[in-house]
Amino acid sequence: MEANKTTEGPQDTQDAKEQPSLEDTNAEDLYEATTHETPLQPSSSQKHFQPPEIHLETPASLNPDTKGAEGLQDSSVSGTPPVKSSSSGLLSLPPQLSPQSVTSLEKAIAEIPLEEFGYDSPISKVKEEPLQLSPTANIPEYGSPISEVQKESLEVSPTANIPEYGSPISEVQKEPLEVSSTANIPKYESPVSEVQKEPLEVSPTASIPESSHELTSDKVPQTQVPESEHFPKHSFSESPTQAKEDESTKEGEAGEDELAVGTSKIPAAKPGLRAKKKKEKRAGGVTSRPVVPAKRAELVEMAKAVHREQFDDQVNNLFQWEKDSTLKAIQTGIYIGWRCPHYLWDCFRIGDESKCFCGHLLREHQIISDLSVPCSVSQCRCLMFCFIPSRPEEVGEFWLKKRATFDPKAWRAQCRCKHTHEEHAATGAHPCRHRGCFCPSFESNFLCVACDRRWEEHETFFETGDTRRKGKRPYGANNIKNWHRTY
Protein backbone atom coordinates (compact mmCIF):
# COMPACT_ATOMS: atom_id res chain seq x y z
CA MET A 1 0.00 0.00 0.00
CA GLU A 2 2.83 2.33 0.75
CA ALA A 3 4.36 1.49 -2.60
CA ASN A 4 1.15 2.42 -4.28
CA LYS A 5 1.07 5.67 -2.44
CA THR A 6 4.61 6.43 -3.43
CA THR A 7 4.14 5.49 -7.03
CA GLU A 8 1.00 7.48 -7.32
CA GLY A 9 2.59 10.52 -5.85
CA PRO A 10 3.71 12.25 -9.06
CA GLN A 11 0.31 11.89 -10.67
CA ASP A 12 -1.34 13.21 -7.59
CA THR A 13 0.87 16.21 -7.62
CA GLN A 14 -0.02 16.89 -11.23
CA ASP A 15 -3.69 16.44 -10.47
CA ALA A 16 -3.30 18.70 -7.51
CA LYS A 17 -1.72 21.34 -9.70
CA GLU A 18 -4.53 21.12 -12.20
CA GLN A 19 -7.27 20.82 -9.61
CA PRO A 20 -6.78 24.20 -8.01
CA SER A 21 -7.28 25.92 -11.32
CA LEU A 22 -10.55 24.10 -11.90
CA GLU A 23 -11.64 24.71 -8.37
CA ASP A 24 -10.78 28.36 -8.76
CA THR A 25 -12.92 28.67 -11.89
CA ASN A 26 -15.84 26.85 -10.30
CA ALA A 27 -15.60 28.95 -7.20
CA GLU A 28 -15.49 32.16 -9.24
CA ASP A 29 -18.55 31.10 -11.22
CA LEU A 30 -20.48 30.34 -8.04
CA TYR A 31 -19.41 33.66 -6.55
CA GLU A 32 -20.51 35.63 -9.59
CA ALA A 33 -23.82 33.78 -9.74
CA THR A 34 -24.59 34.41 -6.11
CA THR A 35 -23.53 38.04 -6.20
CA HIS A 36 -25.44 38.92 -9.41
CA GLU A 37 -28.61 36.97 -8.89
CA THR A 38 -29.44 37.41 -5.22
CA PRO A 39 -27.34 39.68 -3.03
CA LEU A 40 -27.09 38.22 0.46
CA GLN A 41 -26.46 39.96 3.72
CA PRO A 42 -23.73 38.07 5.63
CA SER A 43 -24.68 36.67 9.00
CA SER A 44 -22.85 37.27 12.22
CA SER A 45 -20.88 34.06 11.83
CA GLN A 46 -19.87 34.93 8.32
CA LYS A 47 -18.37 38.29 9.18
CA HIS A 48 -15.24 36.60 10.63
CA PHE A 49 -14.29 35.01 7.34
CA GLN A 50 -12.23 36.57 4.67
CA PRO A 51 -14.23 36.62 1.37
CA PRO A 52 -11.54 35.25 -0.98
CA GLU A 53 -10.65 32.32 1.34
CA ILE A 54 -14.32 31.39 1.95
CA HIS A 55 -15.48 31.39 -1.62
CA LEU A 56 -12.41 29.64 -2.98
CA GLU A 57 -12.03 26.87 -0.43
CA THR A 58 -15.47 25.99 0.90
CA PRO A 59 -17.04 24.75 -2.37
CA ALA A 60 -14.16 22.27 -2.92
CA SER A 61 -14.09 20.95 0.62
CA LEU A 62 -17.80 21.02 1.47
CA ASN A 63 -19.53 19.93 -1.73
CA PRO A 64 -18.83 16.25 -2.46
CA ASP A 65 -20.59 16.57 -5.77
CA THR A 66 -18.00 19.00 -7.06
CA LYS A 67 -15.23 16.67 -6.01
CA GLY A 68 -16.77 13.75 -7.85
CA ALA A 69 -17.33 15.86 -10.91
CA GLU A 70 -13.76 17.09 -10.87
CA GLY A 71 -12.45 13.55 -10.37
CA LEU A 72 -14.46 12.32 -13.29
CA GLN A 73 -13.17 15.19 -15.39
CA ASP A 74 -9.55 14.37 -14.47
CA SER A 75 -10.02 10.69 -15.16
CA SER A 76 -11.56 11.40 -18.50
CA VAL A 77 -8.61 13.61 -19.40
CA SER A 78 -5.82 11.40 -18.14
CA GLY A 79 -7.50 8.10 -18.89
CA THR A 80 -6.71 6.73 -15.37
CA PRO A 81 -9.24 6.08 -12.59
CA PRO A 82 -9.78 8.90 -10.09
CA VAL A 83 -7.31 8.76 -7.22
CA LYS A 84 -7.62 10.62 -3.93
CA SER A 85 -4.83 13.11 -3.83
CA SER A 86 -2.60 13.64 -0.90
CA SER A 87 -2.67 17.37 -1.46
CA SER A 88 -6.20 17.65 -0.11
CA GLY A 89 -4.69 18.85 3.06
CA LEU A 90 -3.84 22.08 1.37
CA LEU A 91 -7.55 22.79 0.94
CA SER A 92 -8.39 22.01 4.52
CA LEU A 93 -10.00 24.67 6.69
CA PRO A 94 -7.75 27.01 8.60
CA PRO A 95 -7.37 26.29 12.29
CA GLN A 96 -9.27 29.42 13.39
CA LEU A 97 -12.55 28.27 11.74
CA SER A 98 -15.04 26.32 13.88
CA PRO A 99 -17.35 23.56 12.57
CA GLN A 100 -20.46 25.62 13.60
CA SER A 101 -19.50 28.46 11.25
CA VAL A 102 -18.99 25.98 8.45
CA THR A 103 -22.45 24.48 8.90
CA SER A 104 -24.08 27.93 8.98
CA LEU A 105 -22.27 28.85 5.81
CA GLU A 106 -23.47 25.67 4.14
CA LYS A 107 -27.04 26.44 5.11
CA ALA A 108 -26.74 30.00 3.79
CA ILE A 109 -25.37 28.77 0.46
CA ALA A 110 -28.04 26.07 0.19
CA GLU A 111 -30.82 28.61 0.83
CA ILE A 112 -29.74 30.86 -2.03
CA PRO A 113 -32.63 30.72 -4.58
CA LEU A 114 -31.59 30.49 -8.16
CA GLU A 115 -34.02 31.98 -10.68
CA GLU A 116 -34.69 29.73 -13.57
CA PHE A 117 -35.74 31.39 -16.81
CA GLY A 118 -38.39 29.26 -18.43
CA TYR A 119 -38.78 30.20 -22.06
CA ASP A 120 -41.11 27.34 -22.96
CA SER A 121 -43.80 28.16 -20.41
CA PRO A 122 -47.31 27.27 -21.67
CA ILE A 123 -49.98 29.97 -21.78
CA SER A 124 -52.04 29.71 -18.61
CA LYS A 125 -55.40 31.07 -19.59
CA VAL A 126 -56.82 32.36 -22.82
CA LYS A 127 -59.83 34.58 -22.55
CA GLU A 128 -62.48 33.88 -25.04
CA GLU A 129 -64.57 36.91 -25.94
CA PRO A 130 -67.41 36.98 -28.48
CA LEU A 131 -66.76 38.87 -31.69
CA GLN A 132 -69.24 41.47 -32.94
CA LEU A 133 -69.87 40.59 -36.53
CA SER A 134 -71.55 42.72 -39.18
CA PRO A 135 -74.07 41.02 -41.54
CA THR A 136 -71.67 41.16 -44.48
CA ALA A 137 -68.43 40.30 -42.62
CA ASN A 138 -66.45 37.18 -43.55
CA ILE A 139 -65.64 35.04 -40.52
CA PRO A 140 -62.18 33.41 -40.62
CA GLU A 141 -61.93 29.78 -39.54
CA TYR A 142 -59.40 29.01 -36.81
CA GLY A 143 -58.54 25.59 -35.44
CA SER A 144 -58.23 26.04 -31.68
CA PRO A 145 -57.62 23.24 -29.10
CA ILE A 146 -60.10 24.85 -26.69
CA SER A 147 -63.37 24.43 -28.61
CA GLU A 148 -64.37 22.30 -31.53
CA VAL A 149 -66.23 24.15 -34.26
CA GLN A 150 -68.60 22.17 -36.38
CA LYS A 151 -68.73 23.31 -39.94
CA GLU A 152 -72.16 23.09 -41.48
CA SER A 153 -73.49 24.06 -44.87
CA LEU A 154 -75.09 27.51 -45.17
CA GLU A 155 -78.62 27.93 -46.35
CA VAL A 156 -79.21 31.45 -47.71
CA SER A 157 -82.82 32.59 -47.56
CA PRO A 158 -84.52 36.04 -47.57
CA THR A 159 -84.71 35.81 -43.79
CA ALA A 160 -81.28 34.90 -42.46
CA ASN A 161 -80.76 31.98 -40.11
CA ILE A 162 -79.83 32.68 -36.54
CA PRO A 163 -76.82 30.97 -34.92
CA GLU A 164 -77.82 28.37 -32.35
CA TYR A 165 -75.45 28.07 -29.45
CA GLY A 166 -75.37 24.94 -27.32
CA SER A 167 -74.30 26.17 -23.89
CA PRO A 168 -73.73 23.73 -20.97
CA ILE A 169 -74.38 26.57 -18.49
CA SER A 170 -77.76 27.95 -19.52
CA GLU A 171 -80.60 26.37 -21.40
CA VAL A 172 -81.69 28.34 -24.44
CA GLN A 173 -85.34 28.37 -25.35
CA LYS A 174 -86.13 28.49 -29.01
CA GLU A 175 -89.34 30.36 -29.72
CA PRO A 176 -90.15 31.60 -33.23
CA LEU A 177 -91.68 35.06 -33.30
CA GLU A 178 -93.25 36.94 -36.17
CA VAL A 179 -91.65 40.35 -36.02
CA SER A 180 -93.43 43.26 -37.72
CA SER A 181 -91.69 46.23 -39.32
CA THR A 182 -92.85 48.56 -36.54
CA ALA A 183 -91.53 46.45 -33.68
CA ASN A 184 -89.60 47.85 -30.73
CA ILE A 185 -86.51 46.52 -28.99
CA PRO A 186 -87.33 44.51 -25.84
CA LYS A 187 -86.16 45.86 -22.51
CA TYR A 188 -84.71 43.34 -20.04
CA GLU A 189 -84.70 44.43 -16.42
CA SER A 190 -84.24 41.06 -14.64
CA PRO A 191 -81.01 38.98 -14.51
CA VAL A 192 -80.94 36.61 -17.47
CA SER A 193 -81.07 32.96 -16.44
CA GLU A 194 -82.86 31.58 -19.43
CA VAL A 195 -82.29 33.46 -22.68
CA GLN A 196 -85.12 33.59 -25.18
CA LYS A 197 -84.01 33.58 -28.74
CA GLU A 198 -85.85 36.06 -30.93
CA PRO A 199 -85.46 36.17 -34.71
CA LEU A 200 -83.58 39.13 -36.11
CA GLU A 201 -84.63 40.94 -39.24
CA VAL A 202 -81.56 40.92 -41.45
CA SER A 203 -81.21 42.01 -45.06
CA PRO A 204 -81.52 39.21 -47.69
CA THR A 205 -77.82 39.48 -48.52
CA ALA A 206 -76.73 38.72 -44.95
CA SER A 207 -75.93 35.13 -43.97
CA ILE A 208 -74.80 33.92 -40.55
CA PRO A 209 -73.39 30.39 -40.06
CA GLU A 210 -75.03 28.00 -37.61
CA SER A 211 -72.50 26.58 -35.19
CA SER A 212 -72.48 25.13 -31.68
CA HIS A 213 -69.80 26.24 -29.27
CA GLU A 214 -68.98 25.13 -25.74
CA LEU A 215 -68.61 28.42 -23.94
CA THR A 216 -66.28 28.61 -20.96
CA SER A 217 -67.68 31.92 -19.70
CA ASP A 218 -71.19 32.93 -18.60
CA LYS A 219 -71.48 35.55 -21.32
CA VAL A 220 -73.85 34.94 -24.20
CA PRO A 221 -72.65 36.38 -27.53
CA GLN A 222 -74.75 39.21 -28.87
CA THR A 223 -75.07 40.52 -32.39
CA GLN A 224 -75.39 44.20 -33.24
CA VAL A 225 -78.73 45.13 -34.75
CA PRO A 226 -79.12 48.26 -36.93
CA GLU A 227 -80.90 51.19 -35.34
CA SER A 228 -83.60 51.16 -38.00
CA GLU A 229 -84.78 47.71 -36.86
CA HIS A 230 -86.90 47.60 -33.69
CA PHE A 231 -88.29 44.61 -31.85
CA PRO A 232 -91.55 44.19 -29.93
CA LYS A 233 -91.45 45.46 -26.38
CA HIS A 234 -92.64 42.76 -23.97
CA SER A 235 -91.52 41.14 -20.74
CA PHE A 236 -90.53 37.50 -20.21
CA SER A 237 -93.91 36.71 -18.69
CA GLU A 238 -95.72 37.65 -21.90
CA SER A 239 -95.86 35.08 -24.63
CA PRO A 240 -95.60 35.83 -28.38
CA THR A 241 -99.19 34.73 -28.86
CA GLN A 242 -100.37 37.61 -26.64
CA ALA A 243 -98.47 40.10 -28.80
CA LYS A 244 -100.15 38.67 -31.90
CA GLU A 245 -103.59 38.99 -30.28
CA ASP A 246 -102.93 42.64 -29.40
CA GLU A 247 -101.93 43.45 -32.98
CA SER A 248 -104.96 41.62 -34.37
CA THR A 249 -107.34 43.52 -32.05
CA LYS A 250 -105.85 46.87 -33.11
CA GLU A 251 -106.25 45.99 -36.78
CA GLY A 252 -109.83 44.84 -36.14
CA GLU A 253 -110.74 48.15 -34.47
CA ALA A 254 -109.23 50.11 -37.36
CA GLY A 255 -111.19 48.00 -39.84
CA GLU A 256 -114.47 48.59 -38.00
CA ASP A 257 -113.91 52.36 -38.11
CA GLU A 258 -113.35 52.23 -41.86
CA LEU A 259 -116.41 50.03 -42.43
CA ALA A 260 -118.55 52.40 -40.40
CA VAL A 261 -117.78 55.19 -42.87
CA GLY A 262 -117.97 53.15 -46.06
CA THR A 263 -115.95 51.09 -48.48
CA SER A 264 -114.36 54.22 -49.99
CA LYS A 265 -112.49 54.92 -46.69
CA ILE A 266 -113.79 58.52 -46.49
CA PRO A 267 -113.61 60.01 -42.96
CA ALA A 268 -116.96 60.42 -41.28
CA ALA A 269 -118.50 63.89 -41.34
CA LYS A 270 -118.33 65.93 -38.15
CA PRO A 271 -121.59 66.50 -36.22
CA GLY A 272 -121.16 70.28 -36.52
CA LEU A 273 -121.22 70.15 -40.32
CA ARG A 274 -124.33 67.94 -40.31
CA ALA A 275 -126.12 70.40 -38.03
CA LYS A 276 -125.32 73.28 -40.40
CA LYS A 277 -126.58 71.34 -43.39
CA LYS A 278 -129.84 70.54 -41.61
CA LYS A 279 -130.41 74.21 -40.83
CA GLU A 280 -129.86 75.18 -44.46
CA LYS A 281 -132.45 72.73 -45.71
CA ARG A 282 -136.04 73.79 -45.60
CA ALA A 283 -139.37 72.46 -46.78
CA GLY A 284 -139.66 72.61 -50.55
CA GLY A 285 -135.89 72.15 -51.14
CA VAL A 286 -135.04 75.88 -50.82
CA THR A 287 -131.70 76.70 -49.15
CA SER A 288 -130.78 80.04 -47.62
CA ARG A 289 -127.32 81.32 -46.75
CA PRO A 290 -126.24 84.62 -45.20
CA VAL A 291 -125.18 87.19 -47.79
CA VAL A 292 -121.62 88.25 -46.96
CA PRO A 293 -119.33 89.97 -49.46
CA ALA A 294 -116.54 87.51 -50.08
CA LYS A 295 -113.91 89.90 -51.41
CA ARG A 296 -114.62 92.98 -49.26
CA ALA A 297 -115.84 91.52 -45.98
CA GLU A 298 -113.81 94.08 -44.03
CA LEU A 299 -116.32 96.80 -44.95
CA VAL A 300 -119.00 95.05 -42.93
CA GLU A 301 -116.70 94.79 -39.94
CA MET A 302 -115.82 98.48 -40.24
CA ALA A 303 -119.49 99.47 -40.38
CA LYS A 304 -120.21 97.40 -37.27
CA ALA A 305 -117.33 99.04 -35.44
CA VAL A 306 -118.76 102.54 -36.00
CA HIS A 307 -121.30 103.72 -33.44
CA ARG A 308 -124.71 103.00 -34.95
CA GLU A 309 -126.41 106.15 -33.62
CA GLN A 310 -123.76 108.51 -35.01
CA PHE A 311 -123.03 106.57 -38.20
CA ASP A 312 -125.61 108.41 -40.33
CA ASP A 313 -124.59 111.83 -39.08
CA GLN A 314 -120.90 111.22 -39.78
CA VAL A 315 -121.56 109.96 -43.29
CA ASN A 316 -123.89 112.83 -44.09
CA ASN A 317 -121.38 115.35 -42.83
CA LEU A 318 -118.63 113.79 -44.94
CA PHE A 319 -120.56 113.81 -48.20
CA GLN A 320 -122.77 116.81 -47.62
CA TRP A 321 -120.39 119.15 -49.44
CA GLU A 322 -120.41 116.86 -52.44
CA LYS A 323 -124.18 116.92 -52.66
CA ASP A 324 -124.44 120.68 -52.29
CA SER A 325 -121.81 121.34 -54.98
CA THR A 326 -123.53 118.96 -57.41
CA LEU A 327 -126.95 120.59 -57.00
CA LYS A 328 -125.46 124.07 -57.40
CA ALA A 329 -123.58 123.00 -60.57
CA ILE A 330 -126.85 121.82 -62.12
CA GLN A 331 -128.53 125.14 -61.29
CA THR A 332 -125.73 127.44 -62.45
CA GLY A 333 -124.31 125.28 -65.23
CA ILE A 334 -120.75 125.72 -63.90
CA TYR A 335 -119.03 122.51 -62.82
CA ILE A 336 -116.06 122.95 -60.48
CA GLY A 337 -113.91 119.89 -59.81
CA TRP A 338 -110.47 118.85 -58.55
CA ARG A 339 -108.76 115.99 -60.37
CA CYS A 340 -105.73 114.89 -62.32
CA PRO A 341 -105.83 116.21 -65.89
CA HIS A 342 -106.30 112.80 -67.58
CA TYR A 343 -109.09 111.62 -65.27
CA LEU A 344 -112.67 111.45 -66.52
CA TRP A 345 -114.15 111.83 -63.03
CA ASP A 346 -113.44 114.37 -60.35
CA CYS A 347 -111.68 113.39 -57.15
CA PHE A 348 -113.57 116.14 -55.29
CA ARG A 349 -116.43 118.41 -56.28
CA ILE A 350 -115.80 121.95 -55.14
CA GLY A 351 -118.51 123.84 -53.25
CA ASP A 352 -118.86 127.13 -51.39
CA GLU A 353 -117.24 125.69 -48.26
CA SER A 354 -114.16 124.48 -50.10
CA LYS A 355 -110.89 126.24 -49.24
CA CYS A 356 -108.39 127.83 -51.59
CA PHE A 357 -104.58 127.62 -51.23
CA CYS A 358 -104.58 131.25 -50.11
CA GLY A 359 -106.69 130.25 -47.09
CA HIS A 360 -110.01 131.69 -48.17
CA LEU A 361 -113.22 129.91 -49.12
CA LEU A 362 -114.70 129.63 -52.61
CA ARG A 363 -117.53 132.00 -51.82
CA GLU A 364 -114.90 134.66 -51.07
CA HIS A 365 -113.71 134.44 -54.68
CA GLN A 366 -115.26 136.04 -57.75
CA ILE A 367 -115.86 133.73 -60.72
CA ILE A 368 -115.20 135.77 -63.85
CA SER A 369 -114.42 132.99 -66.30
CA ASP A 370 -113.08 129.49 -66.30
CA LEU A 371 -109.53 130.94 -66.28
CA SER A 372 -110.00 133.89 -63.90
CA VAL A 373 -111.33 133.41 -60.39
CA PRO A 374 -109.52 136.04 -58.19
CA CYS A 375 -109.88 136.39 -54.44
CA SER A 376 -112.08 139.32 -53.32
CA VAL A 377 -110.43 139.63 -49.90
CA SER A 378 -108.32 142.81 -49.58
CA GLN A 379 -104.57 142.47 -49.62
CA CYS A 380 -104.83 138.92 -51.02
CA ARG A 381 -102.79 138.37 -54.16
CA CYS A 382 -104.60 135.18 -55.18
CA LEU A 383 -105.63 135.42 -58.84
CA MET A 384 -107.04 131.92 -59.33
CA PHE A 385 -108.86 129.61 -56.99
CA CYS A 386 -106.69 126.57 -56.19
CA PHE A 387 -108.35 123.87 -54.09
CA ILE A 388 -106.57 122.34 -51.08
CA PRO A 389 -108.02 119.87 -48.56
CA SER A 390 -109.29 121.51 -45.37
CA ARG A 391 -110.47 118.39 -43.46
CA PRO A 392 -108.39 115.40 -42.32
CA GLU A 393 -110.89 113.00 -43.91
CA GLU A 394 -109.99 114.38 -47.33
CA VAL A 395 -106.40 113.14 -46.98
CA GLY A 396 -107.31 109.85 -45.30
CA GLU A 397 -106.50 110.84 -41.71
CA PHE A 398 -109.80 109.71 -40.20
CA TRP A 399 -108.39 108.86 -36.77
CA LEU A 400 -107.44 112.43 -35.89
CA LYS A 401 -111.00 113.34 -34.88
CA LYS A 402 -110.97 110.62 -32.24
CA ARG A 403 -108.29 112.47 -30.31
CA ALA A 404 -109.60 114.51 -27.41
CA THR A 405 -107.23 117.43 -28.04
CA PHE A 406 -107.85 117.57 -31.79
CA ASP A 407 -109.34 120.80 -33.21
CA PRO A 408 -110.80 120.35 -36.71
CA LYS A 409 -110.81 124.10 -37.40
CA ALA A 410 -107.10 124.42 -36.66
CA TRP A 411 -106.11 121.59 -39.02
CA ARG A 412 -104.12 122.68 -42.10
CA ALA A 413 -102.52 120.79 -44.94
CA GLN A 414 -98.72 120.77 -44.65
CA CYS A 415 -95.79 120.75 -47.01
CA ARG A 416 -92.88 118.33 -46.73
CA CYS A 417 -90.95 121.22 -45.19
CA LYS A 418 -93.38 120.93 -42.23
CA HIS A 419 -94.98 124.33 -42.88
CA THR A 420 -98.64 124.83 -43.69
CA HIS A 421 -99.99 125.99 -47.04
CA GLU A 422 -100.80 129.39 -45.55
CA GLU A 423 -97.05 129.94 -44.95
CA HIS A 424 -96.37 129.49 -48.68
CA ALA A 425 -96.96 132.04 -51.46
CA ALA A 426 -100.43 131.93 -53.02
CA THR A 427 -99.16 132.45 -56.60
CA GLY A 428 -96.64 130.81 -58.85
CA ALA A 429 -94.98 127.62 -57.62
CA HIS A 430 -95.98 128.43 -54.04
CA PRO A 431 -92.54 128.88 -52.43
CA CYS A 432 -92.27 128.86 -48.65
CA ARG A 433 -92.33 132.27 -46.96
CA HIS A 434 -91.17 131.06 -43.58
CA ARG A 435 -87.97 132.74 -42.38
CA GLY A 436 -84.99 130.47 -42.83
CA CYS A 437 -86.83 127.94 -45.03
CA PHE A 438 -85.59 127.54 -48.59
CA CYS A 439 -88.47 125.37 -49.90
CA PRO A 440 -88.91 126.35 -53.59
CA SER A 441 -92.43 124.94 -54.00
CA PHE A 442 -95.19 123.27 -52.06
CA GLU A 443 -94.88 119.48 -51.92
CA SER A 444 -97.64 117.80 -49.99
CA ASN A 445 -96.86 115.32 -47.26
CA PHE A 446 -100.19 113.57 -47.90
CA LEU A 447 -101.94 111.74 -50.72
CA CYS A 448 -105.35 112.13 -52.27
CA VAL A 449 -107.85 109.80 -50.60
CA ALA A 450 -109.51 109.10 -53.97
CA CYS A 451 -106.53 108.34 -56.25
CA ASP A 452 -103.48 108.06 -53.93
CA ARG A 453 -101.61 110.80 -55.77
CA ARG A 454 -99.97 113.97 -54.46
CA TRP A 455 -101.65 117.35 -54.31
CA GLU A 456 -99.32 118.96 -56.90
CA GLU A 457 -100.44 116.39 -59.50
CA HIS A 458 -104.02 117.67 -59.35
CA GLU A 459 -105.68 120.73 -60.89
CA THR A 460 -108.84 122.70 -60.27
CA PHE A 461 -111.20 122.96 -63.27
CA PHE A 462 -114.09 125.40 -63.96
CA GLU A 463 -116.16 123.90 -66.80
CA THR A 464 -119.52 124.37 -68.48
CA GLY A 465 -121.96 121.63 -69.47
CA ASP A 466 -120.80 121.66 -73.10
CA THR A 467 -117.13 121.32 -72.11
CA ARG A 468 -117.87 118.29 -69.93
CA ARG A 469 -120.03 116.75 -72.61
CA LYS A 470 -117.19 117.09 -75.12
CA GLY A 471 -114.74 115.65 -72.63
CA LYS A 472 -117.16 112.73 -72.01
CA ARG A 473 -117.53 113.61 -68.36
CA PRO A 474 -120.77 113.44 -66.40
CA TYR A 475 -122.98 116.57 -66.41
CA GLY A 476 -126.61 117.46 -65.66
CA ALA A 477 -128.64 114.67 -64.06
CA ASN A 478 -125.86 112.16 -64.89
CA ASN A 479 -123.56 114.15 -62.66
CA ILE A 480 -125.72 113.15 -59.66
CA LYS A 481 -125.91 109.47 -60.68
CA ASN A 482 -122.24 109.02 -61.47
CA TRP A 483 -120.55 111.08 -58.78
CA HIS A 484 -119.55 107.92 -56.85
CA ARG A 485 -118.13 105.99 -59.79
CA THR A 486 -114.53 104.80 -59.67
CA TYR A 487 -111.87 105.73 -62.16
Curated annotation (Swiss-Prot):
<feature type="compositionally biased region" description="Low complexity">
    <location>
        <begin position="81"/>
        <end position="103"/>
    </location>
</feature>
<dbReference type="InterPro" id="IPR026755">
    <property type="entry name" value="Fam221a/b"/>
</dbReference>
<comment type="similarity">
    <text>Belongs to the FAM221 family.</text>
</comment>
<feature type="region of interest" description="Disordered">
    <location>
        <begin position="132"/>
        <end position="289"/>
    </location>
</feature>
<protein>
    <recommendedName>
        <fullName>Protein FAM221B</fullName>
    </recommendedName>
</protein>
<feature type="region of interest" description="Disordered">
    <location>
        <begin position="1"/>
        <end position="103"/>
    </location>
</feature>
<feature type="compositionally biased region" description="Basic and acidic residues">
    <location>
        <begin position="243"/>
        <end position="253"/>
    </location>
</feature>
<feature type="compositionally biased region" description="Polar residues">
    <location>
        <begin position="1"/>
        <end position="13"/>
    </location>
</feature>
<feature type="modified residue" description="Phosphoserine">
    <location>
        <position position="248"/>
    </location>
</feature>
<feature type="compositionally biased region" description="Polar residues">
    <location>
        <begin position="36"/>
        <end position="48"/>
    </location>
</feature>
<feature type="compositionally biased region" description="Basic and acidic residues">
    <location>
        <begin position="227"/>
        <end position="236"/>
    </location>
</feature>
<dbReference type="Pfam" id="PF14753">
    <property type="entry name" value="FAM221"/>
</dbReference>
<keyword id="KW-0597">Phosphoprotein</keyword>
